């Protein structure tokens, strides 16, 4: 899933 550290977690 989204990596820890990215502020804008945009799931495509």
UniProtKB/Swiss-Prot annotation:
What's in the GO CC field?
A: extracellular space
Family, per the entry?
Belongs to the tyrosinase family. Hemocyanin subfamily.
Question: What does the record give as the function of this protein?
Answer: Does not function as a hemocyanin.
Q: What species does this protein belong to?
A: Liocarcinus depurator (Harbour crab)
Q: How is this protein named in the record?
A: Pseudohemocyanin
Provide the tissue specificity: Hemolymph.
Q: How does it assemble?
A: Hexamer.
Top-level taxon in the UniProt lineage: Eukaryota
